[in-house]
Amino acid sequence: AEAQFLDLFRATQEERTELVKTGSMELQYAENFTVDYYEDGYKMLTTLPDSQRYLLVPEGQPVPQGLDEDVSILQEPLQNIYLVASGAMDMFASLDAVDQIRFSGQKQENWYIQTAKDAMAAGDMIYAGKYSKPDYELLVSEGCDLAIENRMITHSPEVVEMLQSFDIPVMIEYSSYEQHPLGKVEWVKFFGALTGK
């Protein structure tokens, strides 16, 4: 009976082929991202200018089978983000999520945000190279789980390919595309969903 139960349990785990959508984040001004919610805490984040999709898998939950190949899998909690899109740092700071950024695309002296300066001074955040020349060895050895880039990275497609070849998902931050000033501000909701805040 126990063996049957285990088989049943295994089948149930393996059969998680589709996500059941429960709703979407309401946005008033932002037009360049969406966040969709699914049963059991899964979230799909989409950056619309490049149609990239990122599935956030809650801690302890399986990665769903049968996903489209272009969906990047992000395992929660994200703790080793490489933040190159420096404009997003103030949003991380306002969410109290700077501790999820392990790698910086700027040196300590170039940060104007005190939380970032302090994190680098303490060694909690380390410089991992600018957008066009990341320190791949450092990122891989320290377990980078996501690179958040700005639009400049589109001029260095080889960097994106290299990061992806090391299984580091690449996300481009498009808040500067927003026409409405409050659309830019609303990107804090995107990063809130990303960091679980």
Pin down the residues of each PLM region:
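N-terminal ligand-binding lobe of clamshell/alpha-beta domains
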Residues: 1-197
